[in-house]
């Protein structure tokens, strides 16, 4: 049967969803799921009628062949019987005449059983012949049946291919279902035989049928493998069946959950908490202008924005369970007692803060300070004449030391604002007022330098009114005391005002128990190692205590007061220098005494790790922001700087001040900073990053100096901060792109035109303004409109070449590469001047 005939016989509606399977492969386990056939009723009846007619024709043919075979066997059996009878007659004995009459009855009796035996033998032979005939017939019919079955299978396969092509052409999905299990195929075949009404085969043909079935199985497995490869290689036209896909339904809407976010989190962790793919977060952050990767650490604020953008509720959490467990194991339940006030002296630079404190302490600190200005935060405690103790913190007044002043205000009880009577309110005075208000500390104003002729204390009171600092004279609660730090005038009144203010505040603290405080200043001593100035706020700090201080920890090996004397313990409001920490802590860190050194180390390492993660997240964010800004603005010049200073506070102040110097064109980048002398590592880093090295009150060691000389590194030492900032500004100025300006130096009017064989058109001109110089750039103006811009090629006065022609004189001007000069034109001569730029 040809393909065209098969196609013509194809029913109008044919569903080939005959076998549907879902295979779950896990090791060697295979699960088969079968579905019933879906064939149109009319098609099924037609197929059944054809099959029935075919079977009846085959049955009639088999019966006819069996009848012919039986007749032939009967004929052969009859011939054999006659031959046997003839043989018996020939061997009979001779008959005796006397006995011939008596013989018939006896012989008849004897002959009867013999005849029965012959008949039985004939029947047995006939049965055997019929069985043999049927066996031969079935042997002949079996190959024919197999051929018919194969032909029918081939026709069905072609029908399926035609139907599949039509289905694909119509744009419908085709389910391609195959079995991989031998048992499933055998069961499917049995079901087909039962549903189609096939007769059971004879016993003699079972073995061959099974063999044929095994061969069919083998062929089908090979076909399945080929089809599987086609599907894998995307060669198959049909789509993968829906039954082979995962059987779960996609959620209609996204699930909104409560997302707990720590201080830092990776993109993958955030996606896991929100039960979405990481690519969704990356897409969301790209829309927000952030480029991230799946393993990138992002800070808490960014993660919160992303989660809220995706519709989730955010719960922010600080991951400090370890710290809390360490802090809980502290003895702080002792009775509170009255403590000394901590007083911070603040004010504008050069208003006499340190000199005032020197007079109170009977010391001369100001005389030894570089440039006469304070650049470190100092902590001192003094006793008044009536036996009461006051702790003083002296903060720098320079603008660069904002963080130091803020730190001093945070650790203080009372702020003494020093204002010069001759200068009045200055920028750092205003800043000090803001710090005091932010810290919630009451103010006592000391109007200094009243011994000067131009001093005007009342003007200071008037100026401070606009900053909400109202004196008691005007009905406020701020005490104003007129003092002279140089002559000692009003110092006792100032101390009395401080004591009075502290009594109003009723300051108390726990004296017994484990100490806690704040780091005022820290530095690295070459002989003693890391040194931290700690202001004890509660408890008693003893020698040998284990101190957890920011990222550092350690056992207190030694303690000294502000005068350098060794002490064994320090109570509340006492500033002490502590030795024995693992590193230099940051100024402003909280210092806490804990019981277990191992736990203190764990907390310190945990804090360092979290800080690195946060810093990395911020740096990555800054890099991406810089990348986007550079894409839009172009390249920005960078000045790399390495800062080394004597104390942590100075490092912070310098780095902050340098960052504020950055402009849109030049950016100051601090590539390294630290406390202590300049080492070989610092010099190597400077060489690698092409950076300027800045040493503030520190020097380079011998190995560092060798590297600096070999690599020609720019190293600069400073002891005054404003000198450092001024020189960095000068270096930045040198990196600015030069600015050029055009200055008109002369103007000539064309009176006549001459032709020259060498120079072409020569303009006879009269200089009306300034000076005309040869080889300068010029512009040709016609009716006050620039028509050409070029260069002055030749300049002559009569027949002589001249370098310049002054105002009121005639000259001949040749314009380079331009011959269209006309009478009445103006020739404007200018020069380009470079203008110095500054920051």
Curated annotation (Swiss-Prot):
PROSITE patterns xrefs: G_TR_2, IF2
CDD domains from the UniProt entry: IF2_eIF5B, IF2_mtIF2_II, mtIF2_IVc
Region (G2): 372-376
Superkingdom classification of source: Bacteria
Region called G1, residue ranges: 347-354
Region ranges (G5): 484-486
InterPro entries documented for this protein: EF-G-like_DII, EFTu-like_2, IF2_II, IF2_N, P-loop_NTPase, Small_GTP-bd, T_Tr_GTP-bd_dom, TF_IF2_bacterial-like
Key word Cytoplasm present: yes
Domain tr-type G, residue spans: 338-508
Region (G4): 448-451
Binding site for GTP: 347-354, 394-398, 448-451
GO molecular function: GTP binding; GTPase activity; guanosine tetraphosphate binding; translation initiation factor activity
Main location: cytoplasm
UniProt-annotated stretches for the region G3: 394-397
Coiled-coil region(s): none
Keyword annotations from UniProtKB, A to Z: Cytoplasm, GTP-binding, Initiation factor, Nucleotide-binding, Protein biosynthesis
Alphabetized HAMAP family for the sequence: IF_2_B
Protein name per its UniProtKB record: Translation initiation factor IF-2
Organism: Haemophilus ducreyi (strain 35000HP / ATCC 700724)
Higher taxonomy: Bacteria, Pseudomonadati, Pseudomonadota, Gammaproteobacteria, Pasteurellales
